[in-house]
UniProtKB/Swiss-Prot annotation:
It comes from Streptomyces coelicolor (strain ATCC BAA-471 / A3(2) / M145). Keywords: Heme, Hydrogen peroxide, Iron, Metal-binding, Oxidoreductase, Peroxidase. Residues 1-16 have a biased composition (Basic and acidic residues). Its EC number is 1.11.1.21. GO terms for molecular function: catalase activity; heme binding; metal ion binding. Residues 1-38 are annotated as: Disordered. It catalyses: H2O2 + AH2 = A + 2 H2O; 2 H2O2 = O2 + 2 H2O. Formation of the three residue Trp-Tyr-Met cross-link is important for the catalase, but not the peroxidase activity of the enzyme. The keyword Zinc does not apply. There is a cross-link at W108-Y231 (Tryptophyl-tyrosyl-methioninium (Trp-Tyr) (with M-257)). Belongs to the peroxidase family. Peroxidase/catalase subfamily. This is Catalase-peroxidase. Pfam families: peroxidase (PF00141). There is a cross-link at Y231-M257 (Tryptophyl-tyrosyl-methioninium (Tyr-Met) (with W-108)).
């Protein structure tokens, strides 16, 4: 056998990229990513419902990262990190003798992939270690930053995740350069595989921008202007050095990361108080990114042939800018230079558009030669902070009030690096700030004693006698709980925010119907609480309990009595502690579990169902059994008959699967856009059922059909009920971190 493995891989890559892998070359081996997708690229990718399987975790299922992290001496860890920051290594020399600015960029870019629309991205799992993020153009040379930290990671092992280490190092860098941070929370457990469930954009080449339509309208859920960038192009839109146009891009991308105008200015100015950019030579001198680099480079990429390829010869963005005269010390130098000089356009040694101060003295130190000085320079996006009519006054105020600027940056940095961690109750370590912030979706303390099992039984009876139907109780509980997103741990039933704006007005929640149900539930709550002494039931608990009681009733009617596990202890959030604007991002534009499809969706309903199931952390069997159960319980949007493949709605039977797979039914599209279908009796032609793409996919997709066959079998009635209950309880408790 040949030992020239790299040649084999290269040949396979070449043949694959020549065109069609079947007609003009060899299909890739499964170990190279080959498989069914190359033949049927439009097929559902159910693998996103099997993320991070236990078998892939080398630490084992019993490993408790929270417990391991709490055993750390965090102060000792920080001392070790601080030593790394000022110990320059010959293989990658530190700018100004300090790796702090590099580490700030590393932490920023780890967290900065977060976007509000689906909660994906962010620093929470240390994904910067894996493709595609480890090889994004905007993450150039951050592979060196992580490699510099290996001695620290090696020393503390599994007590300190990479995900926590990246963020903590950013904090230590700021602190050792004279900045007082807002705090730090640990708790980000590592994963062991690259995320395959994040849509980063439609482009197939780096730095392309096919994500825009109309008047520069950025596609949802994306949070960056070009493929492979964290936010914006620092040269301006598509390299056009227009600070005003760049400000528009900045505002939109930072908004999609949950930052307002003040936070945006503080973050950019605070980050650019430190360090420099790198563009010492032409881009074509830079080699392959880490994923494409040769094996002997051992995961390091962007090897440069310009000069020494490092230090003063380093190339990253192609820009060559140092913002302040004290690039390793916190201060107000960024704003001072921004406002005190006028700037003219120039090209960096790499040919990138940047700005240099006109008629300015050479006051900026060189990163590697103490004998050299430079004039102040700025990026196009830096000038946006001065010239934009909204950013400009904010920047001026921060310049004139440095303490206000420092506080704004500290808070914005903390938000940036902790936004995807979920509620404050998940924060770990001695540096967790005492102050509770509204973006953490805070919940109040319980108003009374928690209800017990006897109270639960009493309330179930009252709920079932309240006049609300099984469909109404189930739909309301689902609407409340299914807002949860495993991506950033937001949403869920705890807090009963379904009764607050904006959720009570969402189209998917049928506002008029919801208002009627909530009035009845609030009546049950008042009656119970007025006569229960110290014990109080929250509306949040009552909503979930109502759904669970309805499921029990439906299961009994199907002939399989079951008790749905219920854990009391939820509380009701207040408007004061609910950022209504931030919750607008959680509004579903589609929910296949309720057969709801809003307007403007790019993907067909079955793909949107899969995406929703992924956010709910469901497996493919859980998604399947929930859809089948919710259909027969009548939980469709606006009482739609789509997918109600049963003659006994309200009874928890497996009829959805039995009738979908009935060989005596033929299906035909009933809409031009092929979103709805009718099923007719093959013998008589009589219309029997109506369904959506989110229904028929369980018969058309081979893998989902295999699951549907399990539940359609003659012996599956009881299993179906028990599996539905288990999946139902999982969704109801997704945000009950206190139960873990």
């Amino acid at each position: 056998m040949s030992e020239n493995h790299d040649a084999i891989v290269t040949d396979a890559k070449t043949e694959e990229t020549d065109g069609c892998p079947v007609a003009h070359g060899r299909a890739p081996h499964p170990t190279q990513g080959g498989g069914n997708r190359q033949w049927w690229p439009e097929r559902l990718n159910l693998k996103i419902l099997a993320k991070n399987p236990a078998v892939a975790n080398p630490l084992g299922e019993e490993f408790d990262y929270a417990e391991a992290f709490e055993a750390l001496d965090l102060a000792a860890v920080k001392r070790d990190i601080a030593e790394v920051l000022t110990t320059s290594q010959d293989w990658w020399p530190a700018d100004f003798g300090n790796y702090g600015p590099l580490m700030i960029r590393m932490a920023w870019h780890s967290a900065g992939t977060y976007r509000i629309s689906d909660g994906r991205g962010g620093a929470g799992a240390g994904q910067q270690r894996f493709a595609p993020l480890n090889s994004w153009p905007d993450n150039g040379n951050l592979d060196k930053a992580r490699r510099l930290l290996w001695p620290v990671k090696k020393k503390y092992g599994q007590n300190l995740s990479w995900a926590d280490l990246l963020v903590l190092t950013g904090n230590v860098a700021l602190e050792t350069m004279g900045f007082e941070t807002f705090g730090f929370a640990g708790g980000r457990a590592d994963v062991w595989e690259a995320e395959e469930d994040v849509y980063w954009g439609p482009e197939t080449t780096w730095l392309d921008d096919r994500r825009y339509t109309g008047d520069r309208e950025l596609e949802n859920p994306l949070g960056a202007v070009q493929m492979g960038l964290i936010y914006v192009n620092p040269e301006g839109p598509n390299g056009n050095p227009d600070p005003i146009a760049a400000a528009r891009d900045i505002r939109e991308t930072f908004r999609r990361m949950a930052m307002n105008d003040e936070e945006t200015v503080a973050l950019i100015a605070g980050g650019h108080t430190f360090g420099k950019t790198h563009g010492a030579g032409p881009a074509d001198a830079v080699g392959d990114d880490p994923e494409a680099a040769a094996m002997e480079q051992q995961g390091l990429g962007w090897k440069s042939t310009h000069g020494t390829g490092k230090g003063g010869d380093a190339i990253t963005s192609g820009l060559e800018v140092t913002w302040t005269s004290t690039p390793t010390q916190w201060g107000n130098g960024f704003f001072k230079n921004l406002f005190e000089f006028e700037y003219e356009l120039e090209q960096s040694p790499a040919g990138a558009n940047q700005w240099v101060a006109k008629d300015a003295p050479e006051i900026i130190p060189d990163a590697h030669d103490p004998a050299k000085k430079h004039r102040p320079r700025m990026l196009t996006t830096d000038l946006s902070l001065r010239l934009d009519p909204i950013y400009g006054p904010i920047s001026r105020r921060f310049y004139e009030n440095p303490e206000e600027f420092a506080d704004a940056f500290a808070r914005a940095w903390f938000k940036l690096t902790h936004r995807d961690m979920g509620p404050k109750s998940l924060y770990l370590g001695p540096e967790v700030p005492e102050e509770t912030l509204i973006w953490q979706d805070p919940l109040p303390e319980p108003e009374g004693e928690v209800i017990d099992a006897e109270d639960v039984a009493t309330l179930k009876t009252k709920l079932l006698e309240s006049g609300l139907s099984v469909s109404q109780l189930v739909t309301t509980a689902w609407a409340s709980a299914s807002t949860f997103r495993g991506s950033d741990k937001r949403g869920g039933a705890n807090g009963a925010r379904i009764r607050l704006e904006p959720q009570r007005g969402w189209e998917v929640n049928e506002p008029d119907e919801l208002a009627q149900v909530l009035r009845v539930l609030e009546g049950v709550q008042r009656e119970f609480n007025s006569g229960s002494g110290a014990k109080k039931v929250s509306l949040a608990d009552l909503i979930v309990l109502g759904g669970s009681a309805a499921v029990e009733k439906a299961a009994k009617e199907a002939g399989f009595p079951v008790e749905v596990p219920f854990a009391a202890g939820r509380v009701d959030a207040t408007e004061e502690h609910t950022d209504a604007e931030s919750f607008e991002a959680l509004e579903p534009t589609a929910d296949g579990f309720r057969n709801y499809l809003g307007k403007g969706n790019r993907l067909p309903a079955e793909f949107l169902l899969l995406d929703r199931a992924n956010l709910l952390t469901l497996s493919a069997p859980e998604m399947t059994v929930l859809v089948g159960g919710l259909r027969v319980l009548g939980a469709g949007h606006q009482q739609s008959q789509l997918g109600v493949f049963t003659r006994t709605p309200g009874s928890l039977t497996n009829d959805f699967f039995v009738n979908l797979l009935d060989l005596g039914t033929t299906w035909k599209s009933t809409s031009e856009d092929r979103t709805t279908f009718e099923g007719r009796d093959a013998a008589t032609g009589e219309v029997k059922w109506a369904g959506s793409r989110a229904d028929l996919v369980f018969g058309s997709n081979a893998e989902l059909r295999a699951l549907a066959e399990v539940y359609a079998s003659d012996d599956a009635g009881e299993k179906f009920v028990h599996d539905f209950v288990a999946a139902w309880v999982k969704v109801m408790n997704l945000d009950r971190f206190d139960l873990a």
